[in-house]
Amino acid sequence: MLVHMRKEPASHRTWLRAACLRLCRLHFCLLILYGVLVGVYDSAHLMAPDIIMKRSVTFGILLVANTALWYAAHKEVQKSSYYKWLIYGVVLIDLVLATVSVYTDRGVASRDVALFALPIISAAVLVNRSAIYGTAFLSLAAYVAVSMRYYFLHPNEMLHVEIYGMLVFHSAIFLAVASLLWVVVRARK
C-alpha cells in the first residue's frame, strides 16, 4: 500500500538550506575568532595551560562538527526536517562552546556568559517559538549546571547570595533575549 505524502514547498526548503549554510559560515568565523583568542591568551600567559588545553580541544572538536554540518547542508534533500536537524546541530555547537567557556573562566563570574545568547539567536533561524524558548531553557539549564558545578568545586570565590543573584539575573536575560527574538520572528512571518 502506497502512502501519499504531502510535498513540501520548495521555497521553504530552499530558504532553510540557505539559512543553514549561512549559519555554518558565520560559525566558521566565530570559531576561528575563538581559536585566535585562545592562541593570544596562551602567548600572553593569561590563562593556565590546562584551561588553554581544554579550550583548544573544544575549538578543534567544534570546528570539525561545524565543518561536518556545513558539508551536510550542501546536500540537497527533499525534506525540510533534514535542514532543521542541521540547524539544531549548530545550536548544540553554540551550547557546548558557551558551556565550556563559562566553566573554564570562573563559572558564574565569567565574562563569557554572553555566549549563551548565541544558541538562542541560532534557534531563531528556525522561525519557531518552541525552538527559540526551548533553546533558551536549555541555555539556562546548561548555565545553571556549569555555574553550580564550578561553584561547588571552588566555594570560596563567591558568596551564596551573590551566585544565586547572578544566576537569576542571567537566566532572566536569556528569557528576555528569547522573547525579543520571538517578537521579531513573529513580525516577519
What spans do the regions from the language model cover?
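N-terminal juxtamembrane segment and adjoining first transmembrane helix
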Residues: 1-84, 183, 189
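Alpha-helical transmembrane segments and their interfaces in multipass membrane proteins
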Residues: 36-61, 79-85, 107, 126-186
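Membrane-embedded alpha-helical segments of multi-pass membrane proteins
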Residues: 60-65, 92-96, 111-119, 164-172
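Membrane-helix boundary/interface segments in integral membrane proteins
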Residues: 118-127
